[in-house]
């Protein structure tokens, strides 16, 4: 015989709350879900995403680990 009352209570209209405002409803095991970020205010979904300049990071990595450009190595070899 299966055990009774082992499953959590299901709330079909659980409120998702972001910054004190109900942003959507969904099914969950808690009546209220508090979130910091959701698709309505996430930069990726709102189109306000910033493009990061990774060239500086690559240059910093190359400098840190001594992997300079090949141009500098050729110049040193010809001297």
UniProtKB/Swiss-Prot annotation:
One of its GO terms (cellular component) is ribonucleoprotein complex. Pfam families: Ribosomal_L31 (PF01197). Keywords: Ribonucleoprotein, Ribosomal protein, RNA-binding, rRNA-binding. Signal peptide: none annotated. InterPro entries: Ribosomal_bL28/bL31-like_sf (IPR034704), Ribosomal_bL31 (IPR002150), Ribosomal_bL31_A (IPR027491), Ribosomal_bL31_sf (IPR042105). One of its GO terms (biological process) is translation. GO terms for molecular function: rRNA binding; structural constituent of ribosome. Binds the 23S rRNA. Belongs to the bacterial ribosomal protein bL31 family. Type A subfamily. Part of the 50S ribosomal subunit. HAMAP family: Ribosomal_bL31_1 (MF_00501). NCBIfam families: L31 (TIGR00105), PRK00019.1 (NF000612), PRK00528.1 (NF001809). This is Large ribosomal subunit protein bL31.
């Amino acid at each position: 015989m299966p055990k009774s009352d082992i499953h959590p209570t299901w709330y079909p209209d659980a409120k998702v709350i972001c910054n004190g405002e109900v942003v959507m409803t969904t099914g969950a095991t808690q009546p209220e879900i508090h979130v910091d970020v959701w698709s309505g205010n996430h930069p990726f979904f709102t189109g306000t995403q910033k493009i990061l300049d990774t060239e500086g990071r690559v240059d910093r990595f190359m400098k840190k680990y001594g992997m300079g450009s090949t141009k500098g190595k050729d110049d040193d070899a010809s001297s």
